[in-house]
Structure formats: structure tokens, C-alpha cells
């Protein structure tokens, strides 16, 4: 496996953050949670930050994903990963997570609607699911009795005992 590197990108405009975010997930249309104020938790998370540091995940000069380090007005550090599905399945995500978890044991993840495989991937990597940010159209997960649509989940990493 090639080494990955993180290239710091300082985001000056909130529109740049959301544009990168859409591109990272291949979302071509406007994110549904931005359509009304009460359902804008996802975008409001960025608006409340006082520093947005975006890291591009590079492998052999190719961007394969992004990492967003957010420090909000309450000085809570949260990490956001958007990693291409192909590279995630190849295991690059695991190495990236290990590096980030050296700084924090909590990871905030946005799961696009329908990408339940992303949630399962984090579970397999040793995260316990407390909360996650998802689209308001997440009602199909109600059967699993895991979430309330619109609530934020936080994934908390716990070392696996040997």
C-alpha cells in the first residue's frame, strides 16, 4: 500500500467547503438539508466553525479523498472524512483514521443517503456508533431502531482488546 499524504487547504469561503463536499461524495444536486432552516444541521455545522482546515488525501499525486478538521465556537475538535469508496475498501481509510485518532477519539462522519455501506465500514474498523450526520431522508433506517432522522451521530473509537 502506498503512503498517503495530507495536503492542508485553508478554506476561506463556506461555499468552497460545500462545493468540495459535494464533489467528494459525487453529489450533483443541492444537499436536501439546506432547503429549510430547521433541517440545516449539516450545513450549520460548518457555519458555526471559526476555522476550517481541509486536507486533501493524496496518493501518488492523485486526490482520493478529503479530511476536514473543524474547530467550532465551543472549541470542540471534530474530524470529518470523505474518502472515495474504492480507496476506502482498499484499506487507505484505516491508515488515515489511525493518524487522526492519535489526535482525537471522536470522528464526525457524514453519510449520504443510501450509503449504508459507509456506516458498516466504520463499524468494522472498531467504532461504536453514538451518532452520525445524515440526510433527512433516512427514515428507511428506522427499522433497525438505530437513529432518529435529522440527529447527529458521533462515532467513538475504542481499541479492540487482544
What is the predicted role of each segment?
Residues 103-114:
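Conserved GNAT acetyl-CoA-binding A-motif
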Residues 3-19:
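A short beta-loop-alpha structural element at the N-terminal edge
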Amino acid at each position: 500500500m502506498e503512503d498517503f499524504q495530507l495536503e492542508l487547504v485553508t478554506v476561506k469561503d463556506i461555499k468552497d467547503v460545500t462545493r468540495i463536499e459535494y464533489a467528494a461524495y459525487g453529489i450533483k444536486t443541492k444537499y436536501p438539508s439546506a432547503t429549510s432552516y430547521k433541517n440545516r444541521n449539516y450545513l450549520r455545522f460548518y457555519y458555526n466553525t471559526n476555522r476550517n482546515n481541509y486536507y486533501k488525501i493524496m496518493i501518488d499525486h492523485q486526490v482520493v479523498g478529503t479530511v476536514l478538521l473543524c474547530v467550532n465556537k465551543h472549541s470542540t475538535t471534530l474530524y470529518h472524512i470523505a474518502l472515495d469508496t474504492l480507496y476506502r475498501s482498499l484499506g487507505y481509510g484505516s491508515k488515515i483514521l489511525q493518524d487522526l485518532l492519535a489526535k482525537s477519539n471522536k470522528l464526525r462522519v457524514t453519510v449520504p443517503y443510501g450509503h449504508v455501506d459507509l456506516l458498516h465500514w466504520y463499524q468494522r474498523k472498531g467504532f461504536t456508533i453514538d451518532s452520525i450526520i445524515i440526510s433527512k431522508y433516512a427514515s428507511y433506517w428506522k427499522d433497525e431502531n438505530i437513529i432518529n432522522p435529522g440527529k447527529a451521530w458521533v462515532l467513538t473509537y475504542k481499541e479492540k482488546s487482544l
